[in-house]
Amino acid sequence: KEGYNVYVYSIGNFPTLRCMEQIRYDVAYHNLNVKIVSVGAGYAYGSLGASHHATEELGMMRTIPNMVICSPGDPVEAQVISTVSANYEGPMYLRLGKAGEVIVHQSLIENLKIGDLIPVIRKPNANKALLVSGSILDYAVNRIREFNDLSDVYSIPFVKPLNIEQLHELAIQYPDICVLEEHQKSCGVGSAIIEVINDMYSRSEIPYYPRIKRIAIDDKFYSVSGSQAYLRKLANLVL
């Protein structure tokens, strides 16, 4: 039947990499109202080996036209993004953790629009910004608080599109920006941010090009089984 808001769900790579051609032609090309939901982002299913390490699918999904991509940082973000997805007409990919993710936000997030970045920690004397995508957010927040680092922290619940106005403000405000993500460095969230800021600089929309550091997975497979924490450390996803 027509007219439904369709949700498709599976683990990590299986509703994305395995059926990429069908997503491209049958969903995105026709701009259909289909929401693709995966659980097990990054190394959440690390004990099951490389077949279940969802570490490349963001890069592939964000190259597909018409596709909105969400990667919530905690259950509060996941809740509001679920509502956003139900009200959105068109293809969307929701990249979730596994279960038991730590709640970072202590209150509901209101008026979230597609593409928005969410401030998590703001300091009056901050000289750096840490942009975090996905469920590694709680680790990042804890590390910043532990070391009393002078960084503001922002969650990136939407990988595509990105709020250009917000990124423009960040590029002007912070000379140093770090992007942390549980995904391959190539074609990930950090790449998307660099592309946007590079375009701003090439059009003389920002006075200087901020230093952008990416903490992400190198161009390799980790053919081992282990906990998510173990594999994150193995892949140098550390602050």
PLM features: residue spans?
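Thiamine diphosphate
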Residues: 45, 97-239
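Conserved thiamine diphosphate
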Residues: 1-129
